[in-house]
């Protein structure tokens, strides 16, 4: 059942399982947490922000028989929000005035993408039976949040 939920999420078909909004995840919670975080480490700790509200919402709306579906749904929504934040941060770093090592940043980001994929595949493989998809989803979310925090730390001070 977990694999079915993960496949639905990957195919973008999770929305019909929940009434209304697919997740209840509020991407603004990420911006609020990042704005309040004074250090790179504190920003990376924002990875799980918004999950409690999302889970409460998803559990109230989901009527299926897979107990892991609300968690998978919220992890996916959280990861997608972090991915959007990372992309915006990366694009800003590439276009920042005075940013000369753009090719180095591009290479680093490509290497990081491969690292994240391999790390999260390892998390999937190492997880207890039936928990691999959730472990991989959590890994994707957490690593994307960490990378966002790292790129934010590289921004020049205003």
Give the ranges of each region predicted by the language model:
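N-terminal alpha-helical modules
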Residues: 19-158
């Amino acid at each position: 059942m977990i694999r079915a939920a993960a496949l639905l999420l990957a195919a973008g078909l999770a929305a019909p399982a929940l009434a209304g909004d697919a997740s209840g995840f509020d991407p603004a919670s990420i911006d609020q947490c990042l704005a309040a975080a004074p250090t790179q480490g504190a920003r990376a700790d924002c990875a799980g922000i918004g999950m409690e509200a999302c889970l409460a919402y998803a559990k109230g709306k989901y009527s299926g028989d897979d107990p892991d579906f609300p968690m998978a749904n919220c992890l996916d929504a959280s990861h997608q929000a972090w991915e959007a934040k990372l992309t915006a941060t990366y694009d800003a770093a590439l276009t920042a005035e005075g940013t000369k090592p753009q090719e180095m940043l591009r290479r680093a980001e490509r290497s990081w993408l491969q690292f994240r994929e391999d790390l999260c595949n390892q998390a999937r493989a190492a997880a207890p039976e039936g928990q691999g998809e959730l472990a991989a989803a959590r890994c994707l979310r957490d690593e994307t949040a960490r990378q966002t925090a790292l790129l934010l730390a590289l921004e020049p001070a205003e």
